[in-house]
């Protein structure tokens, strides 16, 4: 196994192994590397959906098995119209976010792989919230230490203008994450359960800092997100077919980037469930 650090505060490219056939010794070494670098990029793995799920399951229980992140419908039609709910779902991911902070249980991580890649390679970006916390000025660090904010997919999609158009017979939405539970409350600074290091927990789903005027909260979170997601704390991966990655959702935010939606794109996303002891929202315990 060869590990080459990326040109960022985190991340590494890993070669010289097959994700489909890891022995226990290699797996133990790989997990330690993952905790150190938070994002591991595996070029040209060409894993199947079943192999991806099996690899992800080594990290822990799955929140859900491999799901397509795509603009290709079940009939094979490419969805590209701006008011199409498929397009809205894809475009919403262009904001920086942690996965499942809007659910009671924040995800531990995710495995992502590329099956169909459009021209321009539709990069995915990641941002290091541990390095962001470490480089906060003293005044801002003191402020955020005691703050908590709510997280909601309704909030983030509505603010971006990407709420689904279609509702079910009950008047709700069938897409994942649009639940009727109380929005999840999370501290802006979370200590990583395995490394013991503090990380910012912010992103597009966060809003309504407790005890702060809503407009002031929105401005503060926008400024914090903008500042946090800057070099050298960011990395954008330009996809090639067959690439796979795994990232630590407790440390990293991520985002999609715009691409020509008239071109097909199909990625596979397997989400790793968080530990209830550390990733359960404050108000869902």
Mark where each language-model region is.
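Non-heme Fe(II) oxygenase catalytic core, chiefly the N-lobe of the double-stranded beta-helix
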Residues: 1-244, 250-285
């Amino acid at each position: 196994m060869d590990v080459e650090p990326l040109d960022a505060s985190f991340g590494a490219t890993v070669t010289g192994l097959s994700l489909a056939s890891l022995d226990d010794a290699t797996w133990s070494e790989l997990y330690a590397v993952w905790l150190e670098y938070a994002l591991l990029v595996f070029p040209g793995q060409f894993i199947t959906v079943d192999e991806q799920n099996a690899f992800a399951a080594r990290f822990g229980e799955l929140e859900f098995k491999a799901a397509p992140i795509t603009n290709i419908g079940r009939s094979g039609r490419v969805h590209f119209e701006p008011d199409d709910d498929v397009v809205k779902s894809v475009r919403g991911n262009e904001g920086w976010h942690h996965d499942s902070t809007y659910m009671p249980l924040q995800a531990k991580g995710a495995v992502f792989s590329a099956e169909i890649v459009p021209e321009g390679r539709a990069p995915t970006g990641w941002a290091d919230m541990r390095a962001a916390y470490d480089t906060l000025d003293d005044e801002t660090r003191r402020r955020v230490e005691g703050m908590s904010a709510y997280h909601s997919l309704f909030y983030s999609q509505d603010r971006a203008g990407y709420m689904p158009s279609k509702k079910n017979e009950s008047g709700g939405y069938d897409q994942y994450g649009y639940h009727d539970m109380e929005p999840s409350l999370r501290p802006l600074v979370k200590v990583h359960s395995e490394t013991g290091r503090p990380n910012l927990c912010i992103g597009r789903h966060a809003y309504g800092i407790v005890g702060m005027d809503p407009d002031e909260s929105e401005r503060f979170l926008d400024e914090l997100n903008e500042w946090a997601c800057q070099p050298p704390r960011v990395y954008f991966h330009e996809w090639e077919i067959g690439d796979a990655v795994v990232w630590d959702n407790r440390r990293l935010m991520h985002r999609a980037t715009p691409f020509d939606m008239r071109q097909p794109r199909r990625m596979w996303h397997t989400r790793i469930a968080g530990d209830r002891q550390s990733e359960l929202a404050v108000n869902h315990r």
